[in-house]
Amino acid sequence: IVNSTDYSDEYETPVLTAGKSFIIGYTNETNGICDRLPVIIFDDFTTDSKLVDFPFKVKSSAMKILRTKGEINIDYIAYYMSITRLIGDTHKRYWISEYSKLLIPIPPYQEQLRIVDTIETIFNEILKITAELS
């Protein structure tokens, strides 16, 4: 967590939020940088999540940093989390009450890779069509 919110575009390390703004600034702080990558950042209040593959710092303890182990593809988990929104009307921390109990179906590793490849192929086609329409 950053000690100071004295951000500057001159600094090197991005400070992240899992929400819409994503990079909220840059810090010159060198301690506590998350550099065991890739990770998924998860906002405990909004349930937004993002896959991150570059070193960063966080602004708030309301953001969880998630890693995979063994034969679990992080892209597969990130895509699964992006379509799974367990959000209600109350302002609460959703990680402990909801998401930590979520059972994610984990197919064999090669199937995870196939699913990710299919999703990315579809997204690339959508981007290509959108660009052609612009």
Give the residues covered by each predicted segment.
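Amphipathic alpha-helical coiled-coil/heptad-repeat segments
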Residues: L102-S134
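DNA target-recognition domains and sequence-specific DNA-contacting regions of bacterial/archaeal
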Residues: I1-I104
